[in-house]
Amino acid sequence: MRMNDYQLEDDPVTKQKYFRRYAPRKGDKIYKEYKKFFFYSDAFRPLKFACEAIIEKYEDEIFELIAQEANHLADMLCNEKSDLCGTPTNSPEP
């Protein structure tokens, strides 16, 4: 997610601040033209801070999920893709 694709706005009714995406997505017709321009604003900093706070709060859970997925991926690559980690075959002893 590119945080500078969002703009901080105030809700006219509730007066709460929220982020609204103003940048087109890759599939949009105007995307190629839009990418020719460079926008920089400090408005995305609160969103970045909020995302970092969420990551910090759930850091242990995130790493646990990554570790579980890494173990699954290692098993899948070893067993299913390369056939290097199968059960040992009985070979005659010398």
Curated annotation (Swiss-Prot):
Pfam families for the chain: DUF3456
Protein origin, superkingdom: Eukaryota
PANTHER family according to UniProt: CANOPY FGF SIGNALING REGULATOR 1 (PTHR13341:SF4), MIR-INTERACTING SAPOSIN-LIKE PROTEIN (PTHR13341)
Family, as annotated: Belongs to the canopy family.
Protein name: Protein canopy homolog 1
Lineage of source species: Eukaryota, Metazoa, Chordata, Craniata, Vertebrata
